[in-house]
Amino acid sequence: MKKKIATMMFVLGLCVSTVLGGCGKKDADSSAESANTESGDSADDSQGDGSTFSNLNTFSCETMDGGMFTQDDFANKDLTVMNFWMTTCAPCVQEMPKLEEIRGTLPDNVQMVLVCLDADTEEEAAKEIIGRTGYTGLVTKSGDGDMEKVNSQILYVPTTLLFDAEGNRVGSTIVGSSPDLEGVYTEAINTALSEMDKEEWKK
């Protein structure tokens, strides 16, 4: 009996932690938060997120300020950190002020880009969230080409992927948010830079 109760408490604990971590993409589409990923989990391509992710060698995205972001914009940096989010995902919105802090301390060879997956239909909501949370970095809409493939492969938001100067996937996948977002991002960025024989991010 004690063993059964302990098992139930463990499962309940996992459920509570996942509610804080992120939203299922389907549930976010219907404006419902759900328990889908353990808070702060990092995963390889085939772990934790249920899918693999394509490279971004050929794509284009409209930015929220009316510009364009393409694969050519990767070439200016050694590493691009892309955070995929939705307007209906509370953890996505809650982490944006911290993402702004992290973005402001990144080294010159690393850039951060936020991709709003539902901005095509929720542009005004996306702009309101960006303004309210104080995020001043680049935010794009969902895009086409290889970006469309990646968007379809994302099961949970927020999901963060890292790409090299040629648009190839590097490092690990960050699925969900985390109370120690800065620590999670620092580890992921330094792992990717190390894989590419680049100097690690010194904080």
Located regions from the model:
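Aromatic-flanked redox-active Cys/Sec active sites in thiol-based oxidoreductases
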Residues: 83-89, 117
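Structural microenvironment flanking redox-active thiols in thiol-disulfide oxidoreductases
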Residues: 93-132, 144-149
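Thiol-/selenol-based redox modules, centered on thioredoxin-like
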Residues: 164-203
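Short, internal strand/loop/helix patches
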Residues: 128-165, 174
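Bacterial N-terminal signal peptides that target proteins for export
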Residues: 1-9
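C-terminal motif of bacterial Sec signal peptides marking the signal peptidase cleavage site
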Residues: 18-22
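N-terminal, intrinsically disordered, polar/charged segments of Gram-positive cell-envelope systems
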Residues: 26-60, 187, 203
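A short beta-strand-turn-helix
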Residues: 58-80, 104
